[in-house]
Amino acid sequence: MTTTAQDNSPKKRQRIINCVTQLPYKIQLGESNDDWKISATTGNSALFSSLEYLQFDSTEYEQHVVGWTGEITRTERNLFTREAKEKPQDLDDDPLYLTKEQINGLTTTLQDHMKSDKEAKTDTTQTAPVTNNVHPVWLLRKNQSRWRNYAEKVIWPTFHYILNPSNEGEQEKNWWYDYVKFNEAYAQKIGEVYRKGDIIWIHDYYLLLLPQLLRMKFNDESIIIGYFHHAPWPSNEYFRCLPRRKQILDGLVGANRICFQNESFSRHFVSSCKRLLDATAKKSKNSSNSDQYQVSVYGGDVLVDSLPIGVNTTQILKDAFTKDIDSKVLSIKQAYQNKKIIIGRDRLDSVRGVVQKLRAFETFLAMYPEWRDQVVLIQVSSPTANRNSPQTIRLEQQVNELVNSINSEYGNLNFSPVQHYYMRIPKDVYLSLLRVADLCLITSVRDGMNTTALEYVTVKSHMSNFLCYGNPLILSEFSGSSNVLKDAIVVNPWDSVAVAKSINMALKLDKEEKSNLESKLWKEVPTIQDWTNKFLSSLKEQASSNDDMERKMTPALNRPVLLENYKQAKRRLFLFDYDGTLTPIVKDPAAAIPSARLYTILQKLCADPHNQIWIISGRDQKFLNKWLGGKLPQLGLSAEHGCFMKDVSCQDWVNLTEKVDMSWQVRVNEVMEEFTTRTPGSFIERKKVALTWHYRRTVPELGEFHAKELKEKLLSFTDDFDLEVMDGKANIEVRPRFVNKGEIVKRLVWHQHGKPQDMLKGISEKLPKDEMPDFVLCLGDDFTDEDMFRQLNTIETCWKEKYPDQKNQWGNYGFYPVTVGSASKKTVAKAHLTDPQQVLETLGLLVGDVSLFQSAGTVDLDSRGHVKNSESSLKSKLASKAYVMKRSASYTGAKV
């Protein structure tokens, strides 16, 4: 019998990098510049409970938290009263330039605070070692609240179905620029923390761009990224109102898994991806019998599903039933003796439904006079971050007017039926209210998950220990919680009469009904531990079960190197696709005409005798002649994916398919006509050689279904004619197999630069290298352009063998196959640009129309939040040095 030594070594824990909008701490700077004060923040209780669980109680995971410090405030002492008062840190008045030593000191303070939190938890059954796991994102600049503008003033309203008046273009642009920098600062910080094999978990709408930024940063890594969206996700009709809608979706689909609070939110997201990104999706059921989607976009697959967040039920019950809470409960009951207590706690914003709640309560008192003097509504309204905004001020006035109206109509000198508290209340007071409540009333008009509802049910589940029964919950149908607490009394908050009837019914329930309701609701409450483990387990399964999990990212085009290579080259060849590359994709192909800016850039490129420019498009000869050849005769043109060519300054087209049998067109056209009749919005584009069936203007689901069916039918007979059936962007094209863009590229590169093309002559691969191009920029966006990129890569490989000693100073042959689209797109190109706008910026850079700074790709930030090596960064460093010198001088009494 063989025995093996038992492995007693500790199990290696999976590292998790948790990315949150803001660290769960409030940071203050005291009177001394080294006096840091750290305290816990309020709000996001469910998320912070998840962070606590991973940090203190999970033995499976090692957590690292990356988050913004939030607005750092300074404590100012009143000279007369000596009382400390908090004021926002404003760099205009008091520059806060932190030295590296100060940043390290504050980080250590945060770590110590986390450890002290752990020591306060005396009854944890599982103890995980506390690591130095807090990694602050530093964004110390003037007007610290600027980082919130785009998320709070543009994204948040749209996600909650609020269409704000259009912002001024320049203001929205500045907000967006800050939003991008905010996400890039996180990417930079994660780059310092990340190790191969880590799981990255990103939370909520401040960080929508981060998944794709991380994929670009860790290009060669099999990186696992999960994203959880805590807020609602709107229908496509609302989401598409966002001016940066595509960029936001592009950012998100860099994740491996995107998760929402409920199925309707995930369905809306998938719909937006289909309509705005031309994505496809397969629907199935997950282990919880909920809908999940495998979304295919840019050649990669993303899992999209829902998993409602929970609460820390164990901690809530522990905190809610203490002697201190017992005494507070007794005090509240004595204050409202013999009265039914309805409680509500909401943020005072336009979606929490405080106004709707007050109107419903007013209707209730009017409809049921027997309840007057018998019921009190205790409403706690927490101030929002933008408390001083005009909208919040108007809402506050409206709420106060309603409260005064109800109290004056139905109250008296001894009693007011509405007790409204516009403040943040301590946790012990909140838990006391949950315990004494006879009814919890939640009337939000839109939210992701209302944790007040979950906490109320949790507390009420244990009231039987006090010889009481759990009391009912009235919940808005527009709250994400209504999909979880299915046995709550669900109402439409806009129907005040229906809500009033529900209040009356809930208050009249007998003990048996309350007991049944309590047990049902308690079983429906998800715990934060289950939510955390399920989400992370799913990501781990994806990582271990999928051999093709690695999604290689195409790096952004290095434009500074491109510019230098362009300047050094003498024989430059430009190869451009048209639709989706030089112009955006539009519903009607006939509307995709060149812009004035494109004409200007092409004219400047053509004016340089060292340049040759070719447009290699799927468009027909007529279109290319009208919009390009007729206006810029210096352009070389290739139509119908290489079927026709027209040389520079030449009037005649050469048909490269002249000897090909075209009888196949009749049969293909008949099949396409059949599907055009069956698919409203589709149409056939009949070129001289190729036939293309377009379905961009159809209902996406129907168009995709019929496109798949059409392709299968065409493939059943096209092999007999040596034809290729290609999937384009919302189209199916049929053309001769031997003709493609790659053959045109091969002909143009293996050619003496600057000499006319002999279309009927074969390709010679024996030309001296110094007669061929030394700079080739090839741009395209779809499947057909991969033939160009593939051919360029093949030629480069050939040149490495034939001319190993003739590389340029950058170690290459000046070949730049560049795809236009997302970095996660499957391609053989060596680099990418995101969209036609970036294409024009890049070409503008080459002809001197655009500065290098304007055409910068991602923004690299320094520790103060400035663009690295920019003018503002240099000024910041100088100001920092001056400030440190001034401060040192004040300590020593010296003059600066």
Curated annotation (Swiss-Prot):
Induction of the gene: By heat shock. Repressed by glucose.
Repeat in keyword set: no
Signal sequence, start to end: none
Coiled coil: none
Ways its activity is controlled: Inhibited by EDTA.
Pfam families per record: Glyco_transf_20, Trehalose_PPase
Gene Ontology CC annotation, any one: mitochondrion
Pathway annotation: Carbohydrate biosynthesis
Keyword Cytoplasm: yes
Entry's family note: In the N-terminal section; belongs to the glycosyltransferase 20 family. In the C-terminal section; belongs to the trehalose phosphatase family.
Subunit note: The trehalose synthase complex is composed of the two catalytic subunits TPS1 and TPS2, and at least one of the two regulatory subunits TPS3 or TSL1.
Other noteworthy facts: Present with 22700 molecules/cell in log phase SD medium.
Function (record text): Phosphatase catalytic subunit of the trehalose synthase complex that catalyzes the production of trehalose from glucose-6-phosphate and UDP-alpha-D-glucose in a two step process.
Name under which the protein is recorded: Trehalose-phosphatase
Source organism (scientific name): Saccharomyces cerevisiae (strain ATCC 204508 / S288c)
Organism ancestry: Eukaryota, Fungi, Dikarya, Ascomycota, Saccharomycotina
